[in-house]
A protein has these predicted regions:
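Phosphate/NTP-binding elements of NTP-utilizing enzymes
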Residues: 1-147
Length: 147
């Protein structure tokens, strides 16, 4: 996976994902997701990262797994939909796919209701971006196809 832009850049650009998890109340999620993608944090972000994880430094490489204890209405679905949109729409996967193969971003959830919520959030991320909106090929009840 080769990012076309960093997650930080995407989350800062209103033409990409800048409106997805904007505002002060989403700062913790932005910090965790940026760190999870292996990007370096600023000092103010590192303080938040340390407070949330107990770690002094971010990993500086993309992580394979992310686990967090987050209560109800803690923003999990919207945050995961945002990073899923980033991975599906703003990263190049030619290094992992053979010509003609289509990538699939699988979102596993507690049940179909929660999976649909995440899919709806991801679709909204694509739709709100004039750039990402162009990537939508098809939407069905349980899938969002992008090209």
């Amino acid at each position: 996976m080769i990012p076309r832009v960093t997650l930080r850049e995407a989350l800062s650009d209103p033409n990409l994902l800048g409106t997805a998890i904007a505002g002060d109340s989403w700062m913790s999620w932005r910090v965790l997701l940026i760190a999870a993608m292996g990007e370096e944090l600023r000092e103010d972000e590192r303080a938040i990262f340390t407070q949330l994880t107990g770690r002094e430094r971010e990993p500086l490489q993309r992580i394979d797994q992310f686990a967090a204890i987050v209560g109800r209405r803690g923003g999990k679905s919207k945050a995961i939909a945002t990073v899923a949109t980033y991975i599906a729409g703003l990263c190049d996967h030619r290094d992992a796919l053979v010509p003609g193969e289509r990538g699939v971003l699988l979102c596993v959830a507690l049940d179909q209701r929660v999976a649909k919520i995440i899919l709806d959030y991801a679709e909204a991320c694509f739709e709100r971006s004039p750039i990402l909106k162009q990537l939508i090929a098809n939407r069905t009840a349980d899938a969002l196809a992008v090209c």
